């Protein structure tokens, strides 16, 4: 049985999450609320919410866990060419936290292969916007000719970034945002981005799975560190445009 959490109930041990032989591997608990305080507690423990409209709030801690080490980010020759163009041409911008709610809404509306509807519900948008207002959630946005054309958002505590979702209205717009984030996190010495679940798109960019135990141990250490600055722009991409950065073709985004 998946535990039901009342408003004051703590999360169970992550070891109680459903295993791979079940229909919902990684499912840890369910609740009726998505209060900011519970959401913060979840991230500090390596837990995240994922559910659809009409369902209770479902809390997950999968094993293994998909991560992206910034130092292992792969840049294909075509993406490197795109990044050089972004650096060179002034009509391309990367903005941070300029339109966080708009990025979330765009991620919610983006079509996903094999998915109907969206898990980014109005309740999710409200909860993460609250984290954004407190400085614990951020959007990295690709702009072209004054229009937001792609981006991503996620949660940050200490020296840990938890990626949530991305979208692109034009080719490579989400990759430009991710590459800019990775370049900034490299500069800051961050060792890990949480990607939650394995996808071919993330794997093509250098993502890999690690054991949940190792992931949670890293989270506990990283979130206890002082927070990093969140002021940067596309100029950080210069570090990713050398021929040493290589990658395979991409697949599906979350």
From Swiss-Prot:
Gene3D superfamilies: Leucyl/phenylalanyl-tRNA-protein transferase, C-terminal domain (3.40.630.70), Leucyl/phenylalanyl-tRNA-protein transferase, N-terminal domain (3.30.70.3550)
Pfam families: Leu_Phe_trans (PF03588)
GO biological process assignments: protein catabolic process
GO molecular function: leucyl-tRNA--protein transferase activity
Cystine connections: none
Main location: cytoplasm
Localisation: Cytoplasm
The keyword Acyltransferase appears for this protein: yes
Function of the molecule: Functions in the N-end rule pathway of protein degradation where it conjugates Leu, Phe and, less efficiently, Met from aminoacyl-tRNAs to the N-termini of proteins containing an N-terminal arginine or lysine.
Protein name (record): Leucyl/phenylalanyl-tRNA--protein transferase
Gene: aat
